[in-house]
């Protein structure tokens, strides 16, 4: 689905990403982990083409990302940013409906799609509420519903980029959103890249984990391969303890 080959990105003279190579497959959730400032969000910005690569190549379905027509790419690749500075004078339903454009389905089908995404994220009771009046967590879910509306029109399995999608959510909504991301991958073939800080969430919901530190990939693989005592010590300088439970293949990291 997505191939990142020897990508380097600088901000002025400062390297942000160094020799990043990574393959993202449809049907899987890949979690990006690393300390603050490691380069996780910079990688997502490169995939959205808001950061220019100095060298290397990013290909999406075997076509260089920069060669995709913008409208077609927008139906197949979308990002939920960590926070949004947008101030909509719209209702919740109207914000979610922005994901329909450019419209490739009938207006009736579009209205039904918006309603289904609102219901999916427990937003139906807020449909007619003014967007600016919402809490931070509610706004985060509204933007996720908008992004999912956008990708629902994709002509092929889409790529969903989530930059700390649970940062403003309570525990119940965190579980709901990450479970949804996993279902989109496993049931509908989405490729999902999610930036997380919670190691236990990464272990529970991700198929693959990529650890970035100082702009470089230092480890990647399954949760069992990556989330080891040595990795946590080397990257986070954290003397982790692992508690094994009967209902999980991965131990709890404390």
Curated annotation (Swiss-Prot):
Gene Ontology MF terms: ATP binding; ATP hydrolysis activity
Enzyme class of the recorded protein, top EC level: translocase
SMART domains: AAA
Residues reported to bind ATP: 34-41
Cellular localization per UniProt: Cell inner membrane
Listed InterPro entries: AAA+_ATPase, ABC_transporter-like_ATP-bd, P-loop_NTPase
GO CC terms of this entry: plasma membrane
Annotated keywords: ATP-binding, Cell inner membrane, Cell membrane, Membrane, Nucleotide-binding, Translocase, Transport
Keyword Signal assigned: no
Chief localization: membrane
Keyword presence, Translocase: yes
ABC transporter domain: residues covered: 2-239
PROSITE patterns: ABC_TRANSPORTER_2, HMUV
Membrane topology of this protein: Peripheral membrane protein
EC number: 7.6.2.-
Top-level taxon in the UniProt lineage: Bacteria
Family statement drawn from the similarity comment of this UniProt entry: Belongs to the ABC transporter superfamily. Heme (hemin) importer (TC 3.A.1.14.5) family.
Subunit structure: The complex is composed of two ATP-binding proteins (HmuV), two transmembrane proteins (HmuU) and a solute-binding protein (HmuT).
Function: Part of the ABC transporter complex HmuTUV involved in hemin import. Responsible for energy coupling to the transport system.
Protein name as catalogued: Hemin import ATP-binding protein HmuV
Natural source organism: Shewanella denitrificans (strain OS217 / ATCC BAA-1090 / DSM 15013)
Gene behind this protein: hmuV
């Amino acid at each position: 689905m997505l191939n990142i080959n020897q990508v380097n990105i600088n901000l002025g003279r400062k390297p942000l990403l160094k020799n990043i190579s990574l393959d993202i497959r449809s049907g899987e959730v890949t979690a990006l982990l690393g300390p603050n400032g490691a380069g996780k969000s910079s990688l997502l910005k490169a995939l959205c083409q808001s950061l220019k690569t100095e060298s290397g190549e990013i290909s999406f379905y075997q076509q260089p990302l920069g060669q995709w027509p913008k409208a077609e790419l927008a139906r197949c690749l979308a990002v939920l940013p960590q926070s949004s500075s947008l101030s909509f004078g719209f209702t919740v339903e109207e914000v979610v409906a922005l994901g329909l454009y450019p419209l490739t389905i009938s207006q009736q089908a579009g209205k039904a799609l918006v309603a289904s995404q609102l219901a999916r994220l427990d937003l139906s009771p807020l449909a007619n509420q003014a967007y600016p009046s919402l809490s931070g967590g509610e706004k985060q879910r509204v933007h996720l519903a908008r992004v999912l509306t956008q990708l629902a029109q994709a002509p092929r399995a889409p790529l969903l980029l989530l930059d700390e999608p649970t940062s403003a959510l309570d525990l119940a909504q965190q579980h709901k959103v990450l479970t949804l991301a996993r279902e989109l991958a496993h049931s509908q073939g989405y490729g999902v890249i999610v930036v997380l800080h919670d190691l236990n969430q990464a272990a529970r919901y991700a198929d693959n984990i990529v650890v970035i530190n100082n702009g470089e990939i230092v480890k990647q693989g399954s949760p069992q391969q990556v989330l080891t005592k040595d990795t946590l010590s080397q990257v986070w300088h954290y003397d982790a303890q692992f508690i094994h439970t009967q209902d999980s293949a991965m131990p709890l990291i404390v």
